[in-house]
């Protein structure tokens, strides 16, 4: 008997219990967040049972199908697909979310609406699980939109702040652009294949470029690729637990997961693979450059997320979706930990986010600073940490790929920049003399803060090794490789470390100077927000205002109604030119009446 699907249903049932509790009086008590956290931890433990059973079963996938409705000739069904991608991702997402929720018990303890906050976090997780386990486009779209609306609600959680509201609107608007591509793909598949079922789509394998372009636009919007990227750093206006969940295992990796899920359609289409490769390469380099000069600790980590998403896109572009999925899973651990460490630092330093006003935290907050270093080193791909097992494989695969040498060089440069801004983050926040106010009380003794970071630190060390052992090879791996190509990823990482340390030591003795154009380009995010959010709307609105004014003048004063009134006024002035001679007017009236009376008689 197959017990994988029943245990998966038990996992989902455990997660829905706190949602049902929100309709009872228990929702109004202070213990509700603890119930939600416990439910997620139990769900993670039960999810490990079907995960181990699946990995030991040597099966490709398990599919459950319940008929829902029939529309003309197309059947809609509630269909769940448990394969390697979905079952591993669900376990990783549950583990990371459990840690983030426990961290939120400490971080959000004073928020008056903490119960609603935890409910939103849980719904965020459930919608992502719907997305990754969906076996048809309609069900996938439900999870896709659910993730989008929950991100809008959570980014704008502190609705009293204008920046938070603006960031939430940015996120939802940029994602609407991606949704257009997704809906166009759904419409094309329905029109030409008469099916939204993934198995039927993969069996028919449409060769048209249009649906694949729609999927690429959808992924670019959701995963903040170049052109649709400005919402990701703006989303840092939300609470830190939201940033951790958004960047690790839910929203931003949904676009990459979509392309991983549809790789059977992309793998034999060189045009879409080249477009994906180039888009990912541009994204990973541009966002790495932007991260080099940022001073907000959360924005540095946010740009590192965008850079890693570009690297995942490059991996899909070289036709290695399993490696992209491995990087999604390994990235979730250290990225969530980095955000939680930054949240701990911000909380202790009285909401200070500027790394130039930190320093010396290795002595004041040794546990948080140590975990921040572990996460940063894992991000750079330091050997035998979690990031190494995916990032090094990706660089090796790119080295042996014949697709695009330009994209490979850009990716290597971005990898070096990753080491540079990670070193800068560690150097400014943890090392050197303290630069924060002396009266700040620093405390990192709360177990709700320490335990989740410890778990994620262990994941950042060991998870990559454990998950990489179960990655099924898509293509026969390279049997031989020159030593210089094997060590290229490590070489550029060490180069980035050395350059960053050298620059940090040199700049301590320099006098302030006017920033050069390259520095301004990086710190102002390539002028992209100013051009897209300020200059372009300004000229469009000015043009619209001028057109509206001209239309009003033409319609009101030249055609109607002012012109009609002017015509009537001119006619009345011509026909009756009044002079104010009342006696003459009265005499004319009497004469007229007398003549009329005589005619009648």
Swiss-Prot record:
Protein name: NADH-ubiquinone oxidoreductase chain 5
Family in the record: Belongs to the complex I subunit 5 family.
Top-level class of the enzyme under EC nomenclature: translocase
Function: Core subunit of the mitochondrial membrane respiratory chain NADH dehydrogenase (Complex I) that is believed to belong to the minimal assembly required for catalysis. Complex I functions in the transfer of electrons from NADH to the respiratory chain. The immediate electron acceptor for the enzyme is believed to be ubiquinone.
Keyword DNA damage: no
UniProt keyword terms in alphabetical order: Electron transport, Membrane, Mitochondrion, Mitochondrion inner membrane, NAD, Respiratory chain, Translocase, Transmembrane, Transmembrane helix, Transport, Ubiquinone
Membrane topology recorded in Swiss-Prot or TrEMBL: Multi-pass membrane protein
MF-aspect GO terms: NADH dehydrogenase (ubiquinone) activity
EC number: 7.1.1.2
Pfam family for this entry, one: Proton_antipo_M
PANTHER family associated with the record: NADH-UBIQUINONE OXIDOREDUCTASE CHAIN 5
Gene Ontology CC annotations of this record: mitochondrial inner membrane; respiratory chain complex I
Subcellular location: Mitochondrion inner membrane
GN (gene name): MT-ND5
GO biological processes: electron transport coupled proton transport; mitochondrial electron transport, NADH to ubiquinone; mitochondrial respiratory chain complex I assembly
Catalysis: reaction(s): a ubiquinone + NADH + 5 H(+)(in) = a ubiquinol + NAD(+) + 4 H(+)(out)
């Amino acid at each position: 008997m197959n017990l994988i699907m029943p245990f998966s249903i038990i996992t989902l049932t455990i997660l829905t219990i706190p949602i049902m509790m929100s309709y009872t009086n228990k929702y109004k008590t202070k213990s509700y967040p603890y119930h939600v956290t416990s439910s997620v931890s139990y769900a993670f433990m039960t999810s490990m049972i079907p995960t181990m059973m699946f990995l030991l079963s040597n099966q490709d996938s398990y599919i459950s199908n319940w008929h829902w409705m029939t529309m003309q000739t197309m059947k809609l069904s509630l269909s769940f697909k448990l394969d390697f991608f979905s079952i591993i991702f669900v376990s990783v997402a549950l583990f990371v979310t459990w840690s983030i929720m426990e961290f939120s018990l400490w971080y959000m303890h004073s928020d008056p609406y903490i119960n609603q906050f935890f409910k939103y976090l849980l719904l965020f997780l459930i919608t992502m699980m719907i997305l990754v386990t969906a076996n048809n486009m309609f069900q996938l779209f439900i999870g896709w939109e659910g993730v989008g609306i929950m991100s809008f609600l959570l980014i704008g959680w502190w609705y009293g702040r204008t920046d938070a509201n603006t960031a939430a609107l940015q996120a939802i608007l940029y994602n609407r652009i991606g949704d257009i591509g997704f809906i166009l793909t759904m419409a094309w598949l329905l029109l030409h294949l008469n099916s939204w079922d993934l198995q039927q789509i993969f069996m028919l394998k449409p060769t048209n470029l249009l649906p694949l372009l729609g999927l690429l636009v959808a992924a670019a919007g959701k995963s903040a690729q170049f052109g649709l990227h400005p919402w990701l750093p703006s989303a840092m206006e939300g609470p830190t637990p939201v940033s951790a969940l958004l960047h690790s295992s839910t929203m931003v990796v949904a676009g990459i997961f979509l392309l991983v899920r549809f790789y059977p359609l992309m793998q034999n289409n060189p045009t879409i693979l080249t477009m994906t490769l180039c888009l990912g390469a541009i994204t990973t380099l541009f966002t790495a450059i932007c991260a080099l000069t940022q001073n907000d600790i959360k924005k540095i980590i946010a740009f590192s997320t965008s850079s890693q998403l570009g690297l995942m896109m490059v991996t899909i572009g070289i036709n290695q979706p399993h490696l992209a999925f491995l990087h999604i899973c390994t990235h979730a651990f250290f990225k969530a930990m980095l955000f939680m460490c930054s949240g701990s630092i911000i909380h202790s330093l009285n909401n200070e986010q500027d790394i130039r006003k930190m320093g010396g935290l290795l002595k004041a907050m040794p546990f948080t600073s140590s975990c921040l270093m572990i996460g940063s080193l894992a991000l750079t791909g330091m050997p035998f940490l979690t990031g190494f097992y995916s990032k090094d494989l990706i660089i090796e695969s790119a080295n042996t790929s014949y697709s695009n040498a330009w994209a490979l060089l850009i990716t290597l440069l971005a990898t070096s920049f990753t080491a540079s801004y990670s070193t800068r983050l560690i150097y400014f926040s943890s090392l050197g003399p303290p630069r924060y106010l002396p009266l700040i009380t620093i405390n990192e003794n709360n177990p709700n803060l320490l335990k989740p970071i410890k778990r994620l630190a262990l994941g950042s060390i060991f998870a990559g090794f454990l998950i990489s052992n179960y990655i099924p090879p898509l293509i026969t791996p390279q049997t031989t490789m020159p030593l210089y190509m094997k060590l290229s990823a490590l070489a550029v990482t060490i180069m980035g470390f050395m350059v960053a340390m050298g620059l940090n030591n040199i700049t301590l003795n320099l006098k302030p100077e006017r920033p050069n154009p390259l520095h301004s380009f990086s710190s102002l995010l390539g002028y992209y927000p100013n051009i897209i959010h300020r200059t372009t709307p300004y000229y469009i609105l000015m043009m619209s205002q001028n057109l509206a004014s001209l239309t009003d003048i033409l319609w009101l004063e030249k055609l109607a109604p002012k012109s009609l009134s002017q015509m009537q006024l001119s006619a009345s002035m011509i026909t009756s030119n009044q002079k104010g001679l009342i006696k003459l007017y009265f005499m004319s009236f009497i004469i007229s009446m007398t003549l009329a009376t005589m005619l009648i008689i």
